[in-house]
Amino acid sequence: MSDKGIEIVNLLAPKVEMLGFDLLGAEYLLVPSGAILRLYIDIPFAMQPECMVSIDDCERVSREVSAYLDLEEPISGNYTLEVSSPGLDRRLFTLEQFARHHNHLVKVGLKLQQHGSRRLQGKIVRVEQVGGFVVLLVNGVELAVDFNNIDKARIVPDWSALGLAPLEKSKHDTKKMSQGSKKPSNESAARQAVRGVIR
């Protein structure tokens, strides 16, 4: 996560937990119209897989978080708030999340080149908390990746094992902010990809 994403997660995580969900991570993206703040929420790990995040859950969290952000104002200028379930191809934001998905296949994008590349794909072998490394099995070779050098990481679902064909990523319309407003509208966009409903 970016520094801004970490700041927002630290601010919002207690609020989201009060609503009964875990805040997995946040993306803060600058766009011509302002910014997009995308939050990923999930059911607490102890309650999985019996329960899962619904569209109504995303909308409820979006409403509560939007009102809270209006008070705290951690973001200046216009922005759109999106709340999503993680989906099968979930983003991984923390070392704990990497450890939880041991032996899963992941795609990793790096800030700086490591092991001759800025893009790696392999299975999560283990997480070394001391030193902050994620060890991946890439083409039969174990590679230690510095967690602080990871820009983005995402699970690669085994679609064939799930009996599913991969879904194309759909584009989600977001509500535009008024041009003259410096503050976000309370009408934040709550979204959930179709892939997020299936576990």
Curated annotation (Swiss-Prot):
Keywords carried by this UniProt record: Cytoplasm, Ribosome biogenesis
Domain of life: Bacteria
Stored Pfam families: DUF150_C, RimP_N
GO CC terms of this entry: cytosol
Segments crossing the lipid bilayer: none
GO biological process, one term: ribosomal small subunit assembly
InterPro entries: Ribosome_maturation_RimP, RimP_C, RimP_C_sf, RimP_N, RimP_N_sf
Region annotation (Disordered) ranges: 170-199
Keyword Cytoplasm: yes
Compositional bias (Polar residues): 177-189
Alphabetical list of CDD domains matching this protein: YlxS_C
SUPFAM superfamilies given in the database record: YhbC-like, C-terminal domain, YhbC-like, N-terminal domain
Subcellular location(s) per record: Cytoplasm
Annotated function: Required for maturation of 30S ribosomal subunits.
Family: Belongs to the RimP family.
Record's protein name: Ribosome maturation factor RimP
Primary gene name: rimP
